[in-house]
């Protein structure tokens, strides 16, 4: 096993890095260096967690997974926004239930400001909020939502008495408690951002249902969303590609900061602006609105160039080929012939989600 690295040093380096070919195809040397550096540091971070927690016990924050370590990385809270579960675990050798109790309370009462929490360190920077992010998404044992510390404490004590589990990782005993979110947790999170979505929809002329479908597919409405490619926030915008393109189109220099993209309103605005760019600029040669929507969705994931190259290396000829096809044929080709399996699945997922939002 590799020696433990100084995580206090790694954490700020992680925060300064960014990368991805996703959602845009801008390329420069600095961006490549950032990509390589981020990948290396994430690998080191994962190795450190494995050294402490054991093989197959590595958990790192992702687009649909909030993971926060505390207590010198001995305690962690994991919210799986896809499955709708919260799992709080500890490998603390002394008073494990006390560590779990504190982490449960903090998780239930945390706010929704990703800029205040460092997901790559063990700093206990989770602030108790008067408007908890999980309010209404979790009900206590009496069926009540949890807003105040007293109710959260009582519920934590109940959980430790009735749902405490343990398992061995071969090195240590892992103590855990799992909490289920309410069945409609996805809708409750989506509702928080409806006003921002409507504003961005009117500003850029992008259908609300498409914005919501992208958000659901990208992050499951997790404002803390990060990815291995360093895509950030609700719509998983990458600073050096889509973010830079949008800033340039708005007459701004540079790239959006991490804090900017972790702000829900700014993230939704930037992601929606990029959808509009794909529709009105990069893929504007596609005449049928349904065919163009399929292309835009796929391009949001894998880039406009990769979409057009499926049909022809010449952009104009590619658009002409698409224009001679029915929307159904375009959909079939994008979901079967795109070189990226992720992009092929992405169109299916977003299109299905958009249909469900249109019916509401």
Swiss-Prot record:
Substrates-to-products reaction catalysed: Exolytic cleavage of the (1->4)-beta-glycosidic linkage between N-acetylmuramic acid (MurNAc) and N-acetylglucosamine (GlcNAc) residues in peptidoglycan, from either the reducing or the non-reducing ends of the peptidoglycan chains, with concomitant formation of a 1,6-anhydrobond in the MurNAc residue
Gene3D superfamilies: 1.10.530.10
CDD domains hit by this protein: LT_MltC_MltE
GO cellular component, one term: cell outer membrane
EC code: 4.2.2.n1
GO molecular function, one term: hydrolase activity, acting on glycosyl bonds
Alphabetic keyword roster: Cell outer membrane, Cell wall biogenesis/degradation, Lipoprotein, Lyase, Membrane, Palmitate, Signal
PROSITE patterns: PROKAR_LIPOPROTEIN, TRANSGLYCOSYLASE
InterPro entries for the chain: Lysozyme-like_dom_sf, Murein_transglycosylaseC, Murein_transglycosylaseC_N, Transglyc_AS, Transglycosylase_SLT_dom_1
Covalent lipid adducts (N-palmitoyl cysteine), residues: 17
Gene Ontology biological-process entries: cell wall macromolecule catabolic process; cell wall organization; peptidoglycan metabolic process
Cell wall biogenesis/degradation is among the record's keywords: yes
Span of the signal peptide: 1-16
Family statement drawn from the similarity comment of this UniProt entry: Belongs to the transglycosylase Slt family.
Protein function: Murein-degrading enzyme. May play a role in recycling of muropeptides during cell elongation and/or cell division.
Identification of the protein by name: Membrane-bound lytic murein transglycosylase C
Gene: mltC
